[in-house]
Amino acid sequence: MKKIIALHALFFSLLILLSGCTNGTIVNPTAEGQAFQINTYNYSDNHYLLDTIYKSNFIDFMAEGMLNTPENINRQISPDNFEVWVQTTNFTADRKFASMLIDLPSLPASGQYNDSFYVPGQIPGKRYFGLFRKLNSSEYYVNYQAGFIGLRINIPDNDYAGVTFKQNGTGQTFGTNSSNFTQDTLVLKMIKAGNIFPQTDTLAWEMKMKNVYRIPVIPILETGFEFQVNFVDPANPTPSPSLPNGRTVLNVVGLDRFIGHGPQLGQDNYFDFLNGRTIITETGDVIFPILRPFYDGILEATNNGFTGGDTTLICKAIYTKLKSEASIAPNNSMYIIKGRVKNF
């Protein structure tokens, strides 16, 4: 019986890896569970803030699981008429042409964008005109309070994606959705640009989240789930759960802030398994509460009040360079994400 279970685990892991939706590696699948390992520069490419202003919402929500400041509460997104569109080359009846802007303003009081918004044009990383298809709700998930989207499908690097949404508190609408507007061409708020470059496509780069890691096994069950972030000192390559100053890495990157499931604050040296917040069990997404955990999180933890943080321990390239460059940058292997999951 154990051999059958082990074979099932191996087959399931291979099936998920072949689907192309994950960023990690399965290590030694057994009947006791499947170990995984993920490099810190290999974050998910499927998660985006709806706008850079939602950085504040994200931090606010991840701290307590709810929004606290009036500004963030006002920006909370309505699920009504929320739409996601991705670039396509397939001409069918349900496709739409769309003009997409990274810095799209809210819809004017007249209820119509100026004609200039509908004119075909392209500025890399900022504006795009093309053919798009509307995603169904099974192809993505949205955190309406934190203001980010997770795509359940992969989109080619050179393709664009955009959304339409309305803010509950302000009443502002961004984009023209297909339910309320009958024009042949839509106007969309760009969330993903094609082939972005950090140095030139600054807004598009900021909106791409680099703090979500997709575990290569789904669905995730809390029972038997293990998640660790270890520090690897170049002078002593044995992985350690702690930084040289004794702070545990899991706490430093924001994933061990509570006793159990909370709300009591404190470290228990276990991953804070908060479904819908630090983990999405259906997709295997682990969401770090800090947008740049291996940069800002490390600096804050090593700040002794005089130096501003130990810059020799940060992985800046993750957040300033493309993955291909970050993978060969200094310190690229200083931290390793690993764990184990049982899903049967």
Locations of regions flagged by a protein language model:
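Surface-exposed, low-hydrophobicity segments enriched in Gly/Pro/acidic/Ser residues
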Residues: 2, 21-344
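Bacterial N-terminal signal peptides
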Residues: 8-19
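Bacterial N-terminal signal peptides that target proteins for export
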Residues: 1-9
